[in-house]
Amino acid sequence: MIENTILKKNKEGKIANVFGLTFPSLELVELAAHAGFDAINCDGEHGLFSPEAIDNICRVANGYGMSVTARVPDKSPYWINLFLDRGVQGIVGPHVESKQEAQDFADACLFPPLGKRSWGGGRGTEFNDDQKLSDYGGKLKYAEWTNSNMLIIAQIESVPGWDNLEEILSVEGLSGITGG
């Protein structure tokens, strides 16, 4: 996995330029790379993204040194795992309305002990390649590295969500919020 380019830019005090997709297009990913974008964001809630499309987009984007983020169809662990296991390094969780929903969402994005993400066998876990994982110091160190490279954004899209904003912002693991 590559370092999360959005978080890297943030740490450097710079703005990351993110190219948004509502449909899968490897050609647009390549054009975004040549145009100087730092990352790709896939709208999996309103767009046309299968897990295979996300996998291919991650492969091409990472090859150009760009991270991929995605808004998942819903914030269930099922969808979050499908996207993260393919190499997505940032998740936007739609329709967050309460502190508990925000906590469950963050937990699904992070490996233990910070969260409850399960260990898959795809790009997001280096395909369980023991040699590659040993480059990070083993599975536990890789999980720590992955957690530190994860962008977790709660999307507030309702009056109850905005009414609970302070509580939502108190959730450990959230990187930020966005409106909708």
Named regions from a protein language model:
Residues 51-85, 109-115, 144-147:
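Alpha-helix-loop-beta-strand connector modules within alpha/beta enzyme cores
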Residues 1-20, 134-148:
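N-terminal amphipathic alpha-helix/helix-capping segment at the start of soluble metabolic enzymes
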Residues 12-17, 37-38, 62-68, 88-89, ...:
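Short, well-ordered coil/turn segments that N-cap beta-strands
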Residues 10-26, 69-73, 150-163:
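Active-site mouth loops of central-metabolism enzymes
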Residues 78, 90-172:
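Conserved anion-binding
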Residues 19, 32, 43, 91, ...:
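Conserved, mostly hydrophobic/aromatic
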Residues 28-56, 179:
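Glycine-rich, proline-tolerant flexible connector loops at the mouths of alpha/beta enzymes
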Residues 21-35, 74-82, 159-171:
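Short, acidic/polar
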